[in-house]
Amino acid sequence: MSKKIKQELENNKLSKRLRHAVGDAINDFNMIEPGDKIMVCLSGGKDSYALLDILRRLQASAPIDFQLVAVNLDQKQPGFPEEVLPTYLESIGVPYKIVEEDTYSTVKRVLDEGKTTCSLCSRLRRGILYRTAKELGCTKIALGHHRDDILATLFLNMFYGGKLKAMPPKLVSDNGEHIVIRPLAYVKEKDLIKYAELKQFPIIPCNLCGSQPNLQRQVIGDMLRDWDKRFPGRIESMFSALQNVVPSHLADTELFDFVGLERGQSLKHGGDLAFDSEKMPERFSDGSEEDESEIKIEPQKAERKVINILANKPKACGA
């Protein structure tokens, strides 16, 4: 097999993997519904480009109709190439809106030199994007955060915030007016890097926040990448943990009624027996099979009807 053919096969595998990962996330969290108008927030980075590209491909084949509109917030950063995004979006035929708001000057004026800008910048952006979604009549706001972003947020909150809290794949805004979705929730960052190279997206670097030294999120990201190299499967296992939460074996008295526990009461996921049910590899080092008596902890899902976004559009009569 020639090197060129082998590379083409790898590229096809990557595209299918990303499509299915995004489709699975959309299905699992019911992110997209018939008639939705989705505002895709486009920053000019690899993640948001990939998000828009994959959603466009799903839109073309999905069994439901939904609209996409790309929105970019021009924060008036010095040297920002204003022509890049309009040129790209017009070339692929996606409706778009460029919102011009000088948040850069606000952040620089309010914060002392050397302070990280992410928190304030994020709050300013969020308010502007919510307002824009309302003006455009959008029903959903799609952000480009991926699996690694979600895990990084989990560790940031544990290390610096004292909370067991990550970044949800789907949420309702504080004012209750907007639904925010993260269709890349199941996607690995390293796959997005490869996809950006494959698609040759016109990447725009963020000089406002990406270049800040000693950024806590960057440190956490480096830690996760190091773990991924040295301990294959660890990142996947950690993300799986976010989908398999056992409140009775944590220590949050608001999440679980420890005070009301009584003898003879059975717990949904077991009492002390749950400590014996740590998931082991499929085969032990001696080659023996895993103990079938292991207690399986499965997430509980609400009963609901969800349209499979990965299914094909129904063919017209006579087609």
UniProtKB/Swiss-Prot annotation:
EC main group: transferase
Subunit-structure text: Homodimer.
Miscellaneous section: The thiolation reaction likely consists of two steps: a first activation step by ATP to form an adenylated intermediate of the target base of tRNA, and a second nucleophilic substitution step of the sulfur (S) atom supplied by the hydrosulfide attached to the Fe-S cluster.
Catalysed conversion reaction: cytidine(32) in tRNA + S-sulfanyl-L-cysteinyl-[cysteine desulfurase] + AH2 + ATP = 2-thiocytidine(32) in tRNA + L-cysteinyl-[cysteine desulfurase] + A + AMP + diphosphate + H(+)
Main location (coarse class): cytoplasm
Gene from which this protein is expressed: ttcA
Name of the protein in its database record: tRNA-cytidine(32) 2-sulfurtransferase
Keywords: 4Fe-4S, ATP-binding, Cytoplasm, Iron, Iron-sulfur, Magnesium, Metal-binding, Nucleotide-binding, RNA-binding, Transferase, tRNA processing, tRNA-binding
